[in-house]
């Protein structure tokens, strides 16, 4: 489980997975596509959250989200969470 992330509290979430192995597979795929992707842990429902990238500002995250929604995953969304 890779918990190292970019500094930032604004995370563009790609997918949530119940099975850890599935989240790791998606992580590898996103990294191959050039994203600075990470698994940021499990949410309160026990789902592993895979993020495309994390950003220090809301504006940066929103800009990336628009591009990702158009090109990768129309269901991507922004999670605001301090992981430190």
What are the roles of these predicted feature ranges?
Residues 1-8, 18-84:
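Extracytoplasmic
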Residues 15:
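Conserved beta3-strand ATP-binding lysine motif
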